[in-house]
Amino acid sequence: MSGSQTLVVKLGTSVLTGGSRRLNRAHIVELVRQCAQQHAKGHRIVIVTSGAIAAGREHLGYPELPATIASKQLLAAVGQSRLIQLWEQLFSIYGIHIGQMLLTRADLEDRERFLNARDTMNALLDNRIVPVINENDAVATAEIKVGDNDNLSALAAILASADKLLLLTDQAGLYTADPRNNPEAELIREVHGIDDVLRGMAGDSVSGLGTGGMATKLQAADVACRAGIDVVIAAGSQVGVIADVIDGTPVGTRFHSLETPLENRKRWIFGAPPAGEITVDDGAVFAIMERGSSLLPKGIRSVKGDFSRGEVIRIRNLNGRDLAHGVSRYNSDALRMLAGHHSQQISEILGYEYGPVAVHRDDMIVS
């Protein structure tokens, strides 16, 4: 749909519990209603949810457990299914399906796993399914630490090629000082660059049930803005906050990115040294240069070098002239097998498929 946006909404434990010891279901119902409203308008919504540990603690009757990683993992293992069941139940009221994605930092730092996660995310969004993301706290170890889901939401926004990231919290945004302790604290409305002064304003506050504070939200905002994604930190209790963010209505603190996600990605492609190269026929040259099309396996004549899926490669014509640089959807061995074949034959030849193109147009810079 023309004009549709992709919005990642991160809900911290303080928002989901309302500062209490249990999930605030009435508040979650309202947030789902807002998300469903925007989904119906054609926008793509991604949820990054905290609250698994809080849900587990509530379900087990608030047991007295030692403050250890194992205790957190126990509570997360119990609470994760309860939490996803709640999201599924509430979105189903509006006829919306959800898809659960449990991630760890390793899934996002390894290139192959990152691409697989991105493909899953895109498949869900393309089919109008709302991805609900949480860290896999039941198996992660070092990842259960301050700010992890804040940082995870920034990485999820990159995975989704999001237009905006909304970090919902129990504060109206970023202040010049802690408003709970300083009555003269002022809300910062617009941020065009994150520096040490701003980091000092964020402090290191952490809520009792969650693992994040304003400082980690600032870290997440920095990561997302560098990837070309605008970020808003706002109160989860703000009426109509999700619509306001999508519509561009001033709310909370807005962090402006310096470029679009596509511009950021293409700048990275331009600067990355090619890991290999492929030669394409005249039909592929015409499709790329004149039609702005993706490169299909059918147009590949030869493959040079050994490279992995997700690496940048050089694309040349039959005379050896550089045409473009792009990110390969398949590794070099796979492309050698696919060269000259139709896209419909990919699964038959390889036994798997990452899509019909060898290099997508959005992952390509023409020389």
From Swiss-Prot:
Substrate binds at residues 50, 137, 149. Keywords: Amino-acid biosynthesis, ATP-binding, Cytoplasm, Kinase, Nucleotide-binding, Proline biosynthesis, Transferase. Pathway: Amino-acid biosynthesis; L-proline biosynthesis; L-glutamate 5-semialdehyde from L-glutamate: step 1/2. It holds the Pfam family AA_kinase. One of its GO terms (cellular component) is cytosol. This is Glutamate 5-kinase. GO terms for molecular function: ATP binding; glutamate 5-kinase activity; RNA binding. It comes from Yersinia pestis. Belongs to the glutamate 5-kinase family. ATP binds at residues 10, 169-170, 211-217. PROSITE patterns: GLUTAMATE_5_KINASE (PS00902), PUA (PS50890). InterPro entries: AceGlu_kinase-like_sf, Asp/Glu/Uridylate_kinase, G5K_ProB, Glu/AcGlu_kinase, Glu_5kinase, Glu_5kinase/COase_Synthase, Glutamate_5-kinase_CS, PUA. It catalyses: L-glutamate + ATP = L-glutamyl 5-phosphate + ADP. Residues 275-353 form the PUA domain. Its EC number is 2.7.2.11. The keyword ATP-binding applies. NCBIfam families: proB. Transmembrane segments: none annotated.
